[in-house]
């Protein structure tokens, strides 16, 4: 909803980790400044309260989405995309919002185990990859398009 803060939404990103008694000790995301300040308010996704950080997400705000997990002595992974905050449905419950990915690069399919993904997870990844190909391919030559097609294939 339009009245949501990043702190409210942060728990949604953490839920799959918390369900497995895991956590990441960094923010889920942060605002990106128009002068390219990488950590710029007023909005962000954090699980720890910071005084004065009550800014609601508004249309046009660019926010990063960067959950990750680090297993000491083993491995770590962190995905980071930039998202544009957009207005969605307006109804009797309020103005709903959604995020549009604006960082359009393929996810490394060799590092993904589709056997542990839900159908919804697969659909999200496949839809994202279809958008990556659709938007980026027209700017590439034929050889580059073939490379992109391989790395944005459906799973």
Enumerate the language-model features and the residues they cover:
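Active-site neighborhoods and metal-handling regions in enzymes and metal-associated proteins
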Residues: 1-155
